[in-house]
């Protein structure tokens, strides 16, 4: 005498920082990135926010690239573009200056926008898959990591800039020393993208 239905739902558990990319369009993500990086120009309203320490009180780590590395025209082009985004906040799924970036969105954007490599938008695993493994990394190569969050395969990627340093989209985009125990424990490989 009645109709009944079975509804099967699969839920995916992910960090709250991933929510904006699922519920916002590109214009909204752009505004969200600006808001989060400036705390709406009202950091006094967010005294306990982690963003105060990340973006306002502690600017990204500066690092001077040795001049001899910049004699490589390809690397100089790459790093000139990449440094434009120092301090941009991490936004899961972000892949442009308008939305800000996640790690693979940042690397894909820099490679493609410079015209050095037409990767399109790839994830960290996709960037690894198109790169040639190298044992002696040079500035402009990519550095890959596993286990930085709960996913299979490559979970993080950065641009190797020489002297055991990388430029990557952590939170915010900044230079980072690869000799720390964290990065050493998650290191997977170096790779050279298919430069034009």
Question: What residue spans do the PLM features occupy?
Answer:
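Catalytic cysteine-centered active-site loop
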Residues: 88-139
């Amino acid at each position: 005498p009645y109709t009944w239905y079975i509804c099967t739902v699969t839920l995916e558990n992910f960090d709250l920082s991933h929510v904006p990319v699922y519920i916002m369009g590109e214009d909204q993500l752009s505004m969200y990135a600006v808001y989060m990086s400036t705390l709406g120009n009202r950091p006094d309203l967010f005294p306990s926010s982690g963003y105060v320490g990340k973006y306002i009180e502690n600017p990204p780590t500066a690092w001077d690239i040795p001049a001899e590395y910049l004699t490589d025209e390809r690397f100089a082009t790459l790093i000139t573009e990449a440094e434009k985004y120092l301090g941009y906040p991490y936004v899961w799924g972000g892949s442009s200056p308008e939305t800000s970036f996640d790690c693979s969105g940042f690397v894909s954007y820099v490679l493609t926008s410079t015209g050095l490599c037409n990767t399109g938008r790839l994830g960290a695993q996709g960037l690894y898959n198109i790169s040639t493994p190298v044992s002696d990394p040079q500035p402009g190569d990519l550095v890959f990591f596993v286990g930085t969050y709960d996913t299979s395969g490559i979970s993080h990627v950065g641009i190797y800039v020489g002297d055991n340093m990388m430029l990557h989209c952590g939170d915010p985009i900044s230079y980072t020393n690869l000799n720390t125990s964290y990065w050493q424990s998650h290191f997977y490989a170096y790779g050279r993208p298919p430069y034009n």
